[in-house]
């Protein structure tokens, strides 16, 4: 999933990354419990190696409600310029939303660690989601820059979990006015 690790001071953004393979494998019944556990341990080990070597790992999960997801899929599919972005898998996930949420919840819980935490982004409102992402990036970078050591000691494969809400508990009805959005966006862009 990472062809080349970025050099110091550079960013790498992954869309889905190794999460996609594991969650789709579970949803399709292609990964046994043993294979799933092995993949989870491999992911945690890799993320720990990155953080041990001074990399900042921030994982964002964009949570959206079933109705809003369906609405956006219909809008994308209804536009000839964006229709290509919607596939059978997208509609399958919307139809089986609860099952998908359960699999994603387990994956997020199993791969959430203090060295590489998950941040659940309420994506019901696109502008609100954008601000949450910027705030998360700013906070993560700020904390990382305060850390005087580039590497943290290895703690014998202990991956403490960070408290995280269940996906079904995330508020998905937040909205922000255009004026508030622009003000907060300017603030976060300066901060970043």
Residue ranges and their predicted role:
Residues 1-191:
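Glycine-rich phosphate-binding loop of ATP-dependent small-molecule kinases
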């Amino acid at each position: 999933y990472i062809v080349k690790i970025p050099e110091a001071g550079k960013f790498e953004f992954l869309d889905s990354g190794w999460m996609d393979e594991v969650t789709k494998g579970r949803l399709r019944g292609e990964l046994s419990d043993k294979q799933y556990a092995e993949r989870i341990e491999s992911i945690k080990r890799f993320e720990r190696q990155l953080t041990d070597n001074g990399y900042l790992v921030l994982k964002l999960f964009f949570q959206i409600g079933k109705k809003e997801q369906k609405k956006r899929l219909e809008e994308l599919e209804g536009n000839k310029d964006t229709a290509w972005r919607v596939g059978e898998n997208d509609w399958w996930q919307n139809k089986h939303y609860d099952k998908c949420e359960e699999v994603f919840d387990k994956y997020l819980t199993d791969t959430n660690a203090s060295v590489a935490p998950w941040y659940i982004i309420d994506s019901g409102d696109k502008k609100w989601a954008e601000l949450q992402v910027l705030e998360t990036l700013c906070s993560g970078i700020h904390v990382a820059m305060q850390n005087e050591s580039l590497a943290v000691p290895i703690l014998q494969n202990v991956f403490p979990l960070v408290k995280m809400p269940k996906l079904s508990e995330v508020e998905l009805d937040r909205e922000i006015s255009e004026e508030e959005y622009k003000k907060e966006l300017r603030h976060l862009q300066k901060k970043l």
